[in-house]
């Protein structure tokens, strides 16, 4: 099924998700699998460093589900100071995830960063 026509959407549900970057590999933050029949509109995405030390963070849009395919960096290896938050996406720079797209994040040190994402599930 194709992603919905946004004008003809029958449901828009506000959601928030959280992800711990438990490794230094790319981790799926938000996923819209093929055949979902949905479009996900990302309103905000924040990265929080939960330690006292600087951690470098990369956040990217992927042209396949589950951080597959090619990554297109939204922010690349940005240093996040200890006990600080980086606002990566906000209402002035929203992203749409069509079917078979995802957002992923990577931290330079495992178990030091959490990512929260507020989005609209449109179908």
Locate predicted features.
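C-terminal interaction-tip segments
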Residues: 2-38, 99-100, 106-123
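Short beta-strand elements of extracellular/lumenal beta-sandwich folds
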Residues: 37-48
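Short solvent-exposed strand-capping/beta-turn motif centered on an Asx-Ser/Thr pair
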Residues: 47-52, 108
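Beta-strand signatures of extracellular beta-sandwich domains
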Residues: 58-62, 116-118
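Intrinsically disordered, low-complexity Pro/Gly/Ser/Thr-rich segments with frequent PxxP/GP/PP motifs
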Residues: 65-100
């Amino acid at each position: 099924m194709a992603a919905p026509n946004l004008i003809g959407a029958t449901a828009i549900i506000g959601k928030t998700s959280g992800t711990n970057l438990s490794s230094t590999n790319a981790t799926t933050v938000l996923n819209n699998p093929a055949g979902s029949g949905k479009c996900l509109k990302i309103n905000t995405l924040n990265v929080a460093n939960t330690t006292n030390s600087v951690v470098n963070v990369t956040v990217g849009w992927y042209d396949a589900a589950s951080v597959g395919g090619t990554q297109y960096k939204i922010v690349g290896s940005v240093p996040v100071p200890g006990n600080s938050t980086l606002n990566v996406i906000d209402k002035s720079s929203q992203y749409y995830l069509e079917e078979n797209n995802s957002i992923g994040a990577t931290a330079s040190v495992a178990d030091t960063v959490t990512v929260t994402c507020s989005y609209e599930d449109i179908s």
